[in-house]
UniProtKB/Swiss-Prot annotation:
Basic residues bias (residue ranges): 79-88
GO MF annotations in UniProt: structural constituent of ribosome
Any one of the GO CC terms: cytosolic ribosome
Region annotated Disordered, chain positions: 79-112
GO annotation, biological process: translation
Name of the protein this chain belongs to: Large ribosomal subunit protein eL36y
UniProt entry keywords in alphabetical sequence: Ribonucleoprotein, Ribosomal protein
Compositional bias annotation for Gly residues: 102-112
């Protein structure tokens, strides 16, 4: 359907009807369904930092290091279930690898 047009106040024609101002309604709870809250994102990042990577994530990282992107995708798909999740995990692991190579990772720095 098309969006309703402003009523003209006339009782004949396409836009017939009484002129009213639209009420601004609060967003429905369903509109935020599936969105991750800031707190949840923070907690997940904290847990990742403390716990480290899962064994399958380490394997994906190793495969990406040697340039076996397709094999890394297959491993991720086998563990995560869907192609979409696997692609996202592969991208996440490759970004972690890039950060480590650029010196952004804390594990690569040596202490004296």
């Amino acid at each position: 359907m098309t969006t309703p047009q402003v009523k003209t106040g006339l009782f004949v024609g396409l836009n017939k009807g009484h002129v009213v101002t639209r009420r601004e309604l609060a967003p429905r709870p369903r509109s935020r369904k599936g969105k991750t809250s800031k707190r949840t994102i923070f907690i997940r990042n904290l847990i990742k930092e403390v716990a480290g990577q899962a064994p399958y994530e380490k394997r994906i990282t190793e495969l990406l290091k040697v340039g076996k992107d397709k094999r890394a995708l297959k491993v991720a798909k086998r563990k995560l279930g869907t192609h979409k999740r696997a692609k996202r995990k592969r991208e996440e692991m490759s970004s972690v690898l890039r950060k480590m190579r650029s010196g952004g990772g804390g594990a690569t720095e040596k202490k004296k």
